[in-house]
Amino acid sequence: MASVLVLVTTSCFLIHCKQKKDIQVPRTVIEDNTTYLIQDSILIQTRDGVKIHAIVVRNSKITKPNPAILFHTIYSRKSDLQKAKMAADHGYVGVISYTRGKGLSPDSIVPFKKEATDTYDVIEWISRQEWSDQKVGMYGGSYVGFVQWASVKHGVHPALKTIVPSVSVAPGIAEPMENGVHQNFHFPWHHYVSNNKYLDTTLYSNGQRWQDLNMKWYGEGVAYNKMDSLDGLPNPQFNERLLHPTYDAYWQSMMPYKEEFSHIDIPVLSTTGYYDGGQTGTRYYLNEHTKYNKDAAHYLVIGPYTHFGAQGKPNTHILGYDIDPAAQIDITGLIFEWFDHILKGKKKPSLLKDKINYEVMGANKWGHAPSLEQMANDTLTYYLSSKRSGVAFKSTYDSGNNGENVHFSLEERPSDPKGYLEQTIDFLDRSNFTWNSSGWGSIIADNLTIGQGFSFVTEPFTSDFEINGSFGGEMSVSINKKDFDYSVALYEQTPDGKFFALTLPYVGRASYVLNREKRQLLRPNIKTKIPFGIVRMTSKKIGKGSRLVVVVNGIKDPFTEINYGSGKPVSEENMTDATPPLVITWYSDSHIDIPVKKNKIYLSMATLCK
């Protein structure tokens, strides 16, 4: 700790004064014939007196002021020096800074809540260093993506010239809940980042512990906010967040909210994937930025990538699917091409031919559009019919479709608008294989998992076309309770009977879909129209002879907060709220709207028969 920064006098915070010399004498390190100047024990004092640990790496050959690349993260690792060196290798000053309390910071660890001002203050500090030319770019994914948006909440620092958020977390929107539904994998995350100054990898990596906890919570039926009591290790951050099920001031204070997006006038490059859990966050920021700033220079790159693949170099094989050669791009390389363009005036990356840049799965090509809406030139609308299609399929558990492995029909017009299918979910039954799980573990599969829900299928298509964008529509339902959680998944069923998952399933809580800031309970046994919240987008060539399949289902499983429908705060509900069983009536005027890009000839067999 001898090399830790000694701060200047208390009357002059670092964020307000230009220092005459480096606050920590750089040490010289030679690697691969490159000489680096490294400061790895810097403490930056924020406006409220907290100290932020930072690392700075420069190439000794660069003697004039230079742009800096900032990576501000909660995931403090001893190996982060390499990330700063990578920026230096690209001709920049590499800066790593950590969430308050992390690394060498002596303060308490505070995830999320102070990043807006702390990151701004780090940028201010960078801009006042002798090696800085007052140009800063930021990049990084997941939490680090959120941090970049937080940094511009109260205004864009004059030195900040661009942000490159990947697979961005959006607290209160896309984590720890998605469209109102909490998911259990967030529970151990708080221990991971808050148990020590770096990361509690040992505890976090104990998959058996978290699996056992999920099963114990599910089996005993205790309230969601008692999960840490079952675990035996207090989790105050997890419980604090459960006190805010709506998108209230607690969440709004963390990142830009509504009109605050209007002042974000720097170029933005976002990256995400069709199979990225963080796509909902990326989509939220894109939607809000372009809504409140009509001139937003916001670019998107999206392809068949997972959460980690969309941050760096995607794997060529993901979840049973070999991605197209065209999709096998170096996203890290693209990011630094972008920095060269914005910070050094070089040519814009060739991939960015328009604002929205997307890889069309199965077509081995990239598409480009000025906006999300312009990715498609038509919409397919299908209604969830209660009539059988006659199309049999292989079911994973033989548990849905009222016990028969035959799809119901997706109709282009509702033949019986008053028709319906009824689903009963018994929350008291926690026996094995009663999980109401629908979804998939492999993008391409022989079987379809529908839980106790229902699957619906189109007629086979007579020509190729592209699905481009996010499906919409509305569910027409009635329930015997006041609320429920549900999922909707979209697949291509190929002529050989295989199922291709087009993106991750949509999940939503009915009482929050209309207004995430105010819960609106359903009236029992009254038919209600429920629109969709944020739906992940996709792009894929749908081949001639293929069909589209939609799976709808209520949610009851060991990995997701259980909404018993009593109307009480869901995190407080327990097995005493389980009766009566939830009865969901899915009406046949429910419809799914699917954005497509078609050529002149585009008809399904059903259309030809009209």
Segments and roles (model prediction):
Residues 79-95, 287:
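Short amphipathic alpha-helix adjacent to the substrate-entry channel of hydrolases
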Residues 60-65, 108-115, 121-142:
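Gly/Ser-rich "nucleophile elbow"/oxyanion-hole loop immediately N-terminal to the catalytic nucleophile
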Residues 55, 64-74, 548:
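Short beta-strand element of the alpha/beta-hydrolase
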Residues 89, 152-262:
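Accessory cap/linker subdomain of secreted extracellular hydrolases
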